[in-house]
Amino acid sequence: MHEYSIVQSMLDLIEENAKKHNAMKVEKVVVKIGVMSGVEAHLLKIAFDTFKEGTLCSDAELEMIIQPIIAKCRACKKESRFEKNEIFYECKHCGDVDLEIVDGEDMILMQLDMN
C-alpha cells in the first residue's frame, strides 16, 4: 500500500511548511486527488489518520477533493471531463481521440489551515 509512503512524505512537507510559518498546529489539510493518480482515497485517509498521531497534524481534518480526468482536444482545443471507469476517451465536442490529459493524474497538496 503506497498510500503510507505518500502520507509520510506529505506529513514531512506539511511540517516543513508549518515550521516556515511558525505554526504550532495544523487544523486542516486539503488535497486534490486525480482519479488517474493511483491513490486510493479511502486508503489515504486511513494512512493519514494512522500517521498523523504525534505530529503537528494530530488533530487535523483531511479534506479530499477527487479530481476527474480533464483532457484537451488537440483538434478543436476544447476540454472534456471523463470518469476513471470510461474505457475509451474521445472529445465530447468533436469526437476526436487526439487528447492531452491536463488534470486528473496527480495528487496535490492544495491548502493547509495552521495556527
From Swiss-Prot:
Coiled coil: none
Entry binding sites for Ni(2+): H2
Alphabetical GO biological process terms: protein maturation; protein modification process
Organism: Nitratiruptor sp. (strain SB155-2)
PANTHER family for this protein: HYDROGENASE MATURATION FACTOR HYPA (PTHR34535:SF3)
A GO molecular-function descriptor: nickel cation binding
The keyword Acyltransferase is annotated on this UniProt entry: no
UniProtKB keywords: Metal-binding, Nickel, Zinc
Record-given protein name: Hydrogenase maturation factor HypA
Physiological role: Involved in the maturation of [NiFe] hydrogenases. Required for nickel insertion into the metal center of the hydrogenase.
Organism lineage string: Bacteria, Pseudomonadati, Campylobacterota, Epsilonproteobacteria, Nautiliales
